[in-house]
A protein has these predicted regions:
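The substrate-binding groove and active-site-proximal loops of carbohydrate-active enzymes
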Residues: 143-156, 203-216, 265-270, 363-366
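Bacterial Sec-dependent N-terminal signal peptides
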Residues: 27-101
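Substrate-binding cleft of secreted/luminal carbohydrate-active enzymes
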Residues: 174, 178, 319-418
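Aromatic- and acidic-residue-enriched segments that line the glycan-binding/catalytic groove
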Residues: 181-201, 243-263
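Aromatic-lined carbohydrate-recognition surfaces of secreted/lumenal glycan-active proteins
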Residues: 116, 234-245, 268-305, 323-328
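Catalytic domains of carbohydrate-active enzymes, especially glycoside hydrolases
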Residues: 111, 115-146, 172-174, 285, ...
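Aromatic-lined substrate-binding rim segments of carbohydrate-active enzymes
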Residues: 131-198, 269-275, 279-282, 376
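An active-site-proximal structural segment forming one wall of the substrate-binding cleft
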Residues: 162-167, 202-240, 275, 279-282
Length: 418
């Protein structure tokens, strides 16, 4: 201790006792602190907890909330962009104008000769009517048998000759293929069923009109006929024919026993109608640019055949399909065939209708008086039937020339304004 005090005394001069005491206390405290820093002694906690089980408690730090004034910004107002509207002139295009489809008008008109059939010994176009200025054409009738002598074999010489005569005279032809009793006899050998009856005192036969073999061969013939002549300029009209009593008209002039036999052979209205429509289609197809017509008669006192057949033709072929009355007289139109007269008037409004005089003034067969002939011609004019077949005997009768000429002038005047 002495040594220490001497060292202190020697190195630290004090001015008085108070300074010396303060220095001593500082040294003591420094020594204690140095001892407390050793590894074996516990640290001195100047603020020990009051109880070892108490958890330290700290006062929460309370801070005033930071209040910031909301940032208020003036809305950005932009003027709308106004652009002038783009005005474009409308595109104006000329409308597409298409010409309407106009169905051809088939003016089947004029004075035609109801001349005799063409055969090996007779010509429909003959010298009796050679120099008649009012004559517009000739009915040329040729039998199917003459033009189709064997199955698949055709002889066109008869018709070629008539066309040659027509060309020389610059006249027209109304063509009719005689069927029925004028059908080829070889049809029976090919299997067609034939029906016998009496015509003008002669026993003849015709193929049953609904027979499949008959229809097949007749259709084949019509097709060949059209292939050869459909474009011929001298053929003005084609009469459609079927297997009937006289091979030209629609009727069957059977007696009661023959009617019974015909029905026993299978006749029904439906079968006959189907036969007619099949043949109409064949002719219309074979002659696509020619007017065609069918003669109308009651069949066994029924109008159904004629009505249905005509409706079929009009529906499919329109203005190209017409009708013919081969019974024409004023008396027949107003008293006998009134329903057929009605059909003619109906068809005339839609296409065309023609007449063939039932008789002649100049012959003893189906005789007419001159007054009856004049009345028949006038009735046809009054109803718009401007196609007329007049018997060649009357055409060659000079006493009737003025009557027939005046009638033909009326036809020309009426058709000129259509």
């Amino acid at each position: 201790m002495q040594t220490l005090n001497n060292k202190i005394s020697n190195k630290t001069p004090f001015k008085n006792a108070s300074d010396a005491l303060t220095s001593i206390l500082f040294l003591v405290l420094s020594s204690l602190l140095l001892v407390g820093c050793g590894g074996g002694s516990a640290p001195i906690d100047l603020n020990p907890p009051s109880n070892s089980n108490d958890t330290p408690t700290t006062d929460p730090v309370v801070t005033d909330p930071v209040v910031t004034d909301p940032v208020v910004t003036d809305p950005v107002v932009t003027d709308p962009v106004v652009t002038d509207p783009v005005v474009t002139d409308p595109v104006v295009t000329d409308p597409v104008v298409t010409d309407p489809v106009v169905e051809p008008t088939y003016k089947v008109t004029g004075t035609f000769c109801s001349c005799g059939p063409t055969s090996q010994t007779n010509s429909s176009i003959n010298r009796d009517t050679e120099n008649l200025d009012y004559l517009d054409g000739v009915l040329v009738r040729i039998s199917w048998a003459d033009m189709n002598p064997q199955a698949g074999i055709y002889d066109w010489s008869y018709l070629d000759e008539q066309i040659g005569y027509a060309e020389q005279r610059n006249t027209k032809i109304a063509l009719a293929i005689l069927n029925g009793p004028y059908a080829p006899t070889w049809l029976a050998e090919e299997g067609a069923t034939m029906f016998e009856y009496t015509l003008r005192g002669n026993v003849v036969s015709l193929p049953l009109p609904w027979d499949a073999v008959y229809l097949s061969y007749y259709q084949a013939f019509i097709e060949e006929l059209g292939a050869r002549y459909s474009g011929n300029e001298f053929i003005d009209l084609v009469h459609i024919t079927n297997s009937t009593t006289n091979g030209f008209e629609m009727q069957y002039t059977f007696d009661s026993a023959q009617i019974t036999d015909f029905k026993t052979a299978g006749y029904t209205e439906e079968l006959l109608i189907n036969s007619w429509t099949t043949i109409i289609d064949a002719y219309a197809t074979a002659f696509p640019n020619k007017p065609v017509d069918v003669e109308v008669h009651p069949v066994f006192f029924s109008d159904k055949i004629a009505t249905d057949v005509v409706d079929h033709g009009l529906a499919l072929y329109g203005k190209r399909f017409g009708v013919l009355a081969a019974w024409w007289s004023e008396h027949n139109a107003k008293n006998v065939y009134t329903s057929m007269f009605t059909i003619l008037k109906k068809v005339q409004k839609e296409s065309f209708a023609g007449v063939q005089l039932v008789g002649a003034v100049s012959t003893g067969l189906n005789p007419l008086t001159e007054e009856q002939l004049a009345a028949a011609l006038q009735l046809a004019i009054d109803n718009g039937f401007y196609y007329m077949e007049i018997w060649n005997n009357d055409l060659a009768n000079t006493q009737l020339s003025d009557l027939i000429t005046n009638n033909d002038n009326l036809i020309e005047a009426q058709t000129a304004v259509q």
